[in-house]
Amino acid sequence: MGSAWTNYNFEEVKSHFGFKKYVVSSLVLVYGLIKVLTWIFRQWVYSSLNPFSKKSSLLNRAVASCGEKNVKVFGFFHPYCNAGGGGEKVLWKAVDITLRKDAKNVIVIYSGDFVNGENVTPENILNNVKAKFDYDLDSDRIFFISLKLRYLVDSSTWKHFTLIGQAIGSMILAFESIIQCPPDIWIDTMGYPFSYPIIARFLRRIPIVTYTHYPIMSKDMLNKLFKMPKKGIKVYGKILYWKVFMLIYQSIGSKIDIVITNSTWTNNHIKQIWQSNTCKIIYPPCSTEKLVDWKQKFGTAKGERLNQAIVLAQFRPEKRHKLIIESFATFLKNLPDSVSPIKLIMAGSTRSKQDENYVKSLQDWSENVLKIPKHLISFEKNLPFDKIEILLNKSTFGVNAMWNEHFGIAVVEYMASGLIPIVHASAGPLLDIVTPWDANGNIGKAPPQWELQKKYFAKLEDDGETTGFFFKEPSDPDYNTTKDPLRYPNLSDLFLQITKLDYDCLRVMGARNQQYSLYKFSDLKFDKDWENFVLNPICKLLEEEERG
């Protein structure tokens, strides 16, 4: 990345606006004022409050329950810990391995799930963890701190200036957390980087760990803004707003002790933003052991897999269901009469009435406008996981069309179930998941995926390393009209190409995908990486500070 991206300076800002000393002096004044107020506030907290009262009570309970002295308090900052999504799975698996690592480890969860009249208790939350993720946790060593100000990090609270509003909200929420119970280690598993300066400047040194799912601002966002016609005070104001925000965001990296990301795409962006060469990737726990075990127990004999593709994705526009359906309709029109058509199953959850309306619009559009026969497409909403497992075990292909999805856990679930992934050639699916792999455990040591894909379809026989197929679309924001058409087909053409593959090719690739998913994305792999990249370094850091 060039200096235009990494080395933001006020000369650039002034060049946009013609400001001379005004912008610089104003920002310096604001920064100095914040520093002074922070110092005054810390002194007031130290002299007027007893922020360790809850911690003392908690430690007494922890010692009584686990029978260990000198416990270490790991504070997990996750205001929406009961949401039940992929981010929460990371949280609870990290909690699980942290507890199992050492009997002296105690967990504090900073959560806002106990307010706003919600009928939620710690027991409810841990029961949900068991039901949703099948993790049995030692509840005697898990404590919850209620955050009454969680609404300050909700995007609906900030109708305008959402980025800075949520940033300020996270700082306040971090202070509400730490003033009730300061931990020995602060771990943010949800992605609120503006909370780190509050933790770093508290009454004592607290190591900070971040597990980042995606950056809150990226080069892509800034490049998109810079390409806008620079006319009018509104555009100039947004440039200043985003540049100053990015400048502050960059400075936060110095506050963090351990930086963990969930994918190569996120890791590359975070390295560029925080100028850190120590970022580590820990892939989310995908429980591939359970899917592979289910497949082995209730396996699919030859001929039992159906000629169908499943789309496992929440019903939200960014998942690009419309693109998939439209491509499928084009595929059906171009399919020779002698070839059996694939059936398409759209399976996902809905969160609101808006999502329900979205599904209905897709159904109406596919039936009334695109004229897709009803027996070739179905929409399955909010299925329990056992029904999803059956669909995965019966299907042959799994489709994911999201552009620049930072990871893509559904794609991993496809592979663990022995499916052939058909995915968009970007971010997580391209860089991390559907990568070449052979029986010797070699990952990504082959030519680029698009070259392998061309060779695969040219020979129509298994090559021992391909794990899935890619497409790109002219509607992609970053579509290269010169290179991309030569490398990747569009989705409708890819549907046509996969109809040429015989059963043996698909069976061999599906079996390879299962072994690959165990090797790279299992819960056990997450446990090992969390121990190596987080727990062991933190223990060394705490020991050094005790000696120092």
From Swiss-Prot:
Membrane topology value: Single-pass membrane protein
Keywords: Endoplasmic reticulum, Glycosyltransferase, Membrane, Transferase, Transmembrane, Transmembrane helix
Catalysed reactions, semicolon-separated: an alpha-D-Man-(1->3)-[alpha-D-Man-(1->6)]-beta-D-Man-(1->4)-beta-D-GlcNAc-(1->4)-alpha-D-GlcNAc-diphospho-di-trans,poly-cis-dolichol + 2 GDP-alpha-D-mannose = an alpha-D-Man-(1->2)-alpha-D-Man-(1->2)-alpha-D-Man-(1->3)-[alpha-D-Man-(1->6)]-beta-D-Man-(1->4)-beta-D-GlcNAc-(1->4)-alpha-D-GlcNAc-diphospho-di-trans,poly-cis-dolichol + 2 GDP + 2 H(+)
GO CC terms, sorted: endoplasmic reticulum membrane
Broad class of enzyme this protein falls into: transferase
Lumenal side: 1-20
Effect on the protein upon substituting residue 407 to A: Impaired activity
Superkingdom of this protein's organism: Eukaryota
Record note on quaternary structure: Interacts with ALG1.
Annotated protein name in UniProt: GDP-Man:Man(3)GlcNAc(2)-PP-Dol alpha-1,2-mannosyltransferase
Species name: Saccharomyces cerevisiae (strain ATCC 204508 / S288c) (Baker's yeast)
This protein's encoding gene: ALG11
